[in-house]
Amino acid sequence: MLLVVVVSALTISDLSAQSDAKIQAAFAESYKAELSGYYVLSVSELRAVYQADNYSINARLGWLLFLSKQYTESVNYYDKAINLKPYAIEARFGMIKALNELKSWDKVKEQYEAILKIDDQNTTSLYWLGVLLYNRKDYDNAAKNFEKIVNLYPMDYGSVIMLAWARLYQGKTGDAKVLFNQAILLSPNDPSATAGLNQIK
């Protein structure tokens, strides 16, 4: 009985090793095809060894389908990857790229917010969520996002100038003036900051 158990364990181990080797080989071929711009071939290499419960395969298929401009399919695979590893933000950023192309702005917003629940100081999410809110004229919430970045990185021009404009549209001209001048310090003769200051005068 013990011998049967040992043999069974070895068989399972051997099968697992063979499966790992096939997946590794498929990834290697997939990378080669991607570098040559053969995205369809790159996708087919991975589909040949597809496992629904494999995060890496799903995330990589999401990326390759994005490169192939198959954005809806890309989102579907990224969604599978996210379900497998909900705290991995890389798949969420990948999905955002595809959602941007689909102009699914509400879903983009949802993903940025989901990332910030995992990592509340993720500056990429803070910035682009801020831009999205700013473009919707939600200046109060946009300013909150930009302010968090400026507190962390006071010399980050992009966040300083966006916070300056958000403050201006909030009617906080005193704060806006300080921020526009800071933007000029970081980017001499900056046209956006100069235009902002001209509106305050």
Locations of the language-model features?
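Short coil turns that delineate tetratricopeptide repeat
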Residues: 52-54, 86, 120, 154, ...
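Alpha-helical segment of the N-proximal tetratricopeptide repeat
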Residues: 22-51, 56, 60-67, 97
